[in-house]
Regions:
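N-terminal targeting or signal-anchor segments and their processing/structural boundaries
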Residues: 2-596
Length: 596
């Protein structure tokens, strides 16, 4: 009965047929040929102890999986025992089988599952065994409940393969940091998990990216997810359930047909320990320091021998990285002694004022330049900058100037902005310049005229209009951009209603790895997405609850989930919007309904 219930069907007929029709080596009169390539994966022929066995010995436990051909272990980490022990299972190839042993005793009266999905392949062609989960107990019964769900990245909402999903009967969050779970499993390529043969009791549900495979959460280096409330299994194990089958991950229909009870969004917590973790002098007058935790609190900062009014500093948006420049064109010493007075975490885990001296040595390239000028490039004596102006988005983002070093002199009013219409008529127009609030080296030029498709726009920068901290002036340049005028391009308009918070709205490409256009809104709005090529796109909307312009992460001990990120779903449940050529689409989105 146990064999029928727990052991997958073995294609005996196929094996017998292969044996009957295989030519005998003794009777052949011609040399053997290569023959067709073997594409059939290994098949289990024997399991010890039998699936569903009870009262399995705790001490020196051995499990044997016998196959119809010689096999090898492709990925030892995929031999996963639940509940996990302090040390991972050991394996040994034994004939056509795999012998699995454990370095420590199993617990008494406990149901175990050994999953071997993506672990075993045949010895010759590498055909992968589709997977199997062996269930056994050291007690006199087999636990019979199960839970299912999916794990995804909190920002991209892409499924995460290989996350460790954990169940704890200890409901204190500290358990995740201190001991291994009462049951666990790894997610597949769809981010899907099924923790089977567990007790009928109340659990905490977590997932982690277990970097060191110790089945314990380490917040400084690993990502985590948690379900907001306690859970109780409601589904009993039945080997006919789709959720318990082993599917080819390319079988989309079957994989999507599996029911998912819980959804976990995995995130990286902010480090709680504050200290300087990295520092580097990257140029004659440039250096940076980085902190372990965001929002570093700096009281004062100085470099020995450098007047305070010559020091320029800038934090990044998360305030965990600080750029430092010395505003002095003369040659600087080979070593800077940077002093930073900041709030540092002490041995008791408390923040205290601390002054740290950091030695910053000039990079070798700069030292070599002292004795040799022959390799000096033109850009090494110029005020270097770029102008970013993409045809598809320039009317929204403007012409973005970014300088390599901070400016000490500028004459933005000396620039020329002109445009040529389709009739080849040329006009000069006024413009505005705004310095970026987060990057003092970035400036945005916006014309005082609406930018139109098919028009050519020019920004001309004359010679010696900008001077940086090195004392270098700029070279002259001109950029040209033409707004797209292709009749085949399409437009998507989003009508967003019931906007009761601040939201970040992104249009992404099909792979979700490129933002086509982005908006930040805090009221009902109509957002245009013009100049779209035919293809599939998705709409990602992030709820910026604290209105800081950043997608804030979660906090496990505070039971705070990361700020919610959702993809707009069509009526059929898909997130991809198919946009044909020469189309104007309009979509209404009720944000209050979407984020309720």
């Amino acid at each position: 009965m146990f064999l029928k219930k727990y052991l997958p069907a073995i294609p005996v007929i196929i094996i017998l047929a292969m044996m009957i029709f295989t030519d005998s080596c003794a009777n052949t009169t011609t040399p053997p040929s290569g023959g067709p390539k073997d594409t059939i994966p290994p098949v289990i022929t024997k399991i010890e102890p039998l699936p569903g066995s009870i009262n399995v010995p705790r001490h020196k436990t051995k499990l044997l999986l016998q196959f119809n051909e010689y096999v090898t272990i492709k990925d030892p980490k995929s031999l996963f025992l639940s509940p996990p022990l302090e040390k991972a299972p050991k394996y040994k190839l034994q004939g056509k089988g795999v012998l699995i042993t454990f370095e420590c005793d199993l617990d008494s009266a406990k149901t175990y599952t050994l999953d071997v999905t993506n672990a075993i392949g045949d010895n010759n062609e590498g055909n992968m065994f589709p997977g199997y989960t062996l269930v056994f107990s050291t007690g006199d019964r087999i636990d019979s409940m199960m839970v299912t769900g999916t794990v995804q990245d909190c920002n991209t909402l892409k499924p995460l393969k290989g996350a460790t999903v954990m169940l704890y009967k200890d409901h204190a969050d500290s358990a995740l940091f201190l001991r291994r779970p009462d049951a666990a499993v790894k997610t597949d390529e769809w981010g899907y998990f099924c923790i089977r043969n567990i007790q009928d009791t109340v659990y905490r549900l977590y997932a982690i990216i277990d970097e060191n495979n110790n089945n314990i959460y380490e917040s400084e280096t690993e990502k985590v997810a948690f379900f907001d409330t306690l859970i109780t299994p409601v589904v009993k194990v039945n080997d006919t359930l789709p959720e318990l089958q082993k599917y080819d991950m390319k079988d989309t229909a079957s994989c999507l047909a599996r029911k998912s009870e819980y959804e976990l969004n995995i995130f990286k917590e902010k480090p709680t320990k504050q200290l300087i973790v990295n520092k580097e002098r990257i140029g004659e007058r440039t250096a940076y320091i980085t902190f372990m935790a965001p929002y570093a609190q700096i009281d004062s900062i100085w470099i020995k021998g450098v007047p305070s009014d010559q020091l320029i500093t800038q934090f990044n948006i998360m305030q965990d990285s600080l750029e430092i420049w010395v505003n002095d064109p003369k040659e600087q010493p080979d070593t800077f002694f940077l002093n930073v007075n900041y709030m540092k975490t002490d041995s008791l885990g408390l923040l205290n004022s601390f002054t740290e001296e950091i030695k910053l040595v000039k990079p070798k390239k700069s030292l070599a330049a002292k004795s040799s000028k022959k390799d000096m490039k033109k850009e090494d004596t110029l005020c270097v900058f770029t102008i970013d102006a993409k045809p598809e988005t320039v009317e929204q983002y403007g012409f973005v100037f970014e300088f390599k070093y901070p400016l000490v002199e500028d004459a933005f009013d000396s620039l020329t902005f002109r445009y040529v219409n389709p009739k080849q008529q040329e006009y000069t127009e006024k413009y505005s310049i705004v310095q970026d609030s987060l990057n003092l080296r970035k400036y945005v030029l916006r014309p005082n005229v609406e930018m139109l498709p098919g028009y050519e726009y020019f920004v001309k920068v004359p010679h010696r209009k900008f001077k940086d901290i090195n004392g270098f002036y700029n070279d002259s340049t001109e950029v040209k951009v033409t707004l797209p005028n292709d009749d085949k391009l399409s437009t998507l308009s989003l009508n967003l209603i019931n906007v009761n918070n601040k939201y970040i709205v992104d249009l992404l490409n099909e792979k979700r790895d490129k933002i086509m256009r982005s908006y930040v809104i805090d009221k009902d709005s109509t957002l245009p997405f013009p100049y779209l090529k035919s293809g599939k796109y998705s709409i990602r909307i992030t709820e910026d609850v604290n209105r800081n312009g950043v997608v804030d992460t979660g906090n496990l001990l505070e039971h705070k989930q990361p700020e919610k990120v959702l993809f707009y779903k069509l009526e059929d449940g898909t997130v991809l919007i198919n946009i044909p050529e020469m189309t104007e689409l309009e979509q209404n989105i009720d944000l209050a309904e979407m984020f309720k």
